[in-house]
Amino acid sequence: RVLFRSIRKDNLMLWMTGEEWSKVLDISLNGFFNVTQPLLKNMLVKRYGRIVNIVSLSGIQGMPGQANYSAAKGGVIAATKALAQEVAKKKVTVNAVAPGFIRTDMTEGIDENEWKKHIPAGRFGTPEEVADLVGFLASPASSYITGEVISINGGLYT
């Protein structure tokens, strides 16, 4: 099971509305619970499962104008780590993938040429690169990896 449901409602905290805050947290953080919790029992009974949450570089380092998005993704990261400890003995792994700048609708409107200057790899990532990482984490080959947040960001760090 891979969870990726997200929206951005970027705004400086000073100008952010309660609705902008709540909507982002509801979709990302509550979405994690609402999708994951109903699937757990079956995974635990079968003694096998892979849960891969898609988070964000923003959830690791925070981004100005994205306090709501950063908080939501940071919350999913913390929940990933906690849940991994709860279910590891039943051979269920729980990990998160934290993409940086990936060419998707989430990065539309961002000046790619400007941001590429800050990325050591010199480019935005592709959805296929993220999918390859998710595929590995969903495979039997990743059975000893759990509770981890794996960044896929071309070397972009704080």
Predicted regions and their residues:
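C-terminal substrate-recognition "lid" of short-chain dehydrogenase/reductases
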Residues: 40, 48, 124-152, 156-157
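Short, small-residue-biased leader/transition segments that mark boundaries at the very start
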Residues: 1-3
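Active-site helix of classical SDR
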Residues: 36, 72, 80
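Active-site loop immediately N-terminal to the catalytic Tyr-X3-Lys motif
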Residues: 14, 61-67, 89-90, 122, ...
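Substrate-binding pocket helix/loop in short-chain dehydrogenase/reductase
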Residues: 11-13, 20-22, 51, 107, ...
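Alpha-helical segment proximal to the catalytic Tyr-Lys
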Residues: 41, 85-89, 143
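Residue(s) in the substrate-gating loop at a strand-loop-helix junction
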Residues: 56
